[in-house]
Amino acid sequence: MLPVIALVGRPNVGKSTLFNQLTRSRDALVADFPGLTRDRQYGPGRVGGFPYMVVDTGGLSGEAETLDNLMARQTQQAIDESDVVLFLVDGREGLTAADQAIARSLRTQGKKVLLVVNKTDGVDADQAMAEFHALGFGAPIPIAATHGRGVLGLMNAVHALLPEVEEIQAEAERWPGIRIAFVGRPNAGKSTLINRILGEERVVATEIPGTTRDSIFIPFERDGQQYTLIDTAGVRRRSRVHEAIEKFSVVKTLQAIDAAHVVVMVLDAREGISEQDAHLLGVVLDAGRALVVAINKWDGLDPDQRDRIRHELDLKLPFLDFAEKRFISALHGTGVGDLFAHVKRAYDSAFIKVSTNHLTKLLESAMVAHQPPLVSGRRVKLRYAHQGGQNPPIIVIHGNMTERLPGSYKRYLSNHFRQHLKLVGTPIRLEFKTGENPYAGKRNVLTPRQQYKRKRMMRHAKKK
């Protein structure tokens, strides 16, 4: 599971600015998808080979927070689920009573806490940090989040407190088969669906806590295929599941999505598509995971209601045209068995392997059917393509002036590859690389022989 970093502090100390610094590497990934709603309260990031997840507790609790509700339920939940807490204070304003109150609360949590003094640009950092030593969290770390100064050093300090990336990845990799995360807002029927699936199985392992945060990895087998179900709802007995008391955890959901091969998004057909559903789907798309959308509680809807839901899916989720959509009833089991065939198809598409030769031929056929546009009178040239990764499939295309290729042509290429590779249920990502111009930055200097020849030609021209 990805390590979780919680940003804690009173309002206006720079939590959101630091959040943007720590997650900016992912901002551009979904910018081209119309209709996609993103939530800026939590998100994944990476520094070098160190992946992590950031939770902005200020955003979770509301920016108009007061000292009384600063440690409200959602903020406390984020702290409970975090591996490291970054306690932000304002170096310009100095130590306040609110800072001291937050420090007292954090000391009772038993969490790894780094004290971060923000807004140290333009002030004496040593002097600004001196009074914060009294909070008892060790040496403060100075940063200027607005300019990004000190952020890399801060993340190195965070990294030193956490297990190595290989250990984090090994925890998920030790679970067999296709890992499936069932996500959805409370009361959408996720728990009923999970219990329906497990109730049908004859080979079900004991529920084993996957992490200290109680996400559950449940191995089981169906039709000879091994699966591991990632349940984000915590440790619970199957006989005691009550959806009404199910708690929605953003952190557990994000971790489950990251650990999964395929995500099954459960929607409530009777309530339609909510803003929270769109946020979750945006996170899945951001992570590049294969996706099956299960529209639950389909039984009991009349034909007009079903048509309305289908129209709403097309209208509100145009960016999920690649995803498999299944209509089910978790309570009665209708359509549940068919989910696994679609999960397997999505998994196979996400982990497809394609040769460079085949991808280059597909690129050439795409250009024959619809050649790249002219840019400033010159045509963009695309030379060859190769695979750059799996889950999601990444296709790297090399050429000239690729950075000037319009988004419409990139979408055309994406659809062309998807259609000819028969990819179902997985997003596809294209990366464009422009070859270096060997003459860039060089002056066109004549050789001595060329200079002599030029002089002769000029003398000859003057005689005429």
UniProtKB/Swiss-Prot annotation:
Single GO MF descriptor: ATP hydrolysis activity
Residue ranges annotated for the KH-like domain, each copy included: 352-436
Annotated positions binding GTP 1: 9-16, 56-60, 118-121
Similarity section: Belongs to the TRAFAC class TrmE-Era-EngA-EngB-Septin-like GTPase superfamily. EngA (Der) GTPase family.
Function summary: GTPase that plays an essential role in the late steps of ribosome biogenesis.
Protein name in UniProt: GTPase Der
Origin organism lineage: Bacteria, Pseudomonadati, Pseudomonadota, Gammaproteobacteria, Chromatiales
Stretches assigned to the EngA-type G domain: 3-166, 178-351
Keyword GTP-binding: yes
Pfam families tied to this protein: KH_dom-like, MMR_HSR1
Ranges in coiled-coil conformation: none
Residues the record lists as binding GTP 2: 184-191, 231-235, 296-299
Entries under SMART domains matching the protein: AAA
NCBIfam families: GTPase_EngA, small_GTP
UniProt entry keywords in alphabetical sequence: GTP-binding, Nucleotide-binding, Repeat, Ribosome biogenesis
KW Repeat (keyword) present: yes
Oligomer and partners: Associates with the 50S ribosomal subunit.
GO terms under biological process: ribosome biogenesis
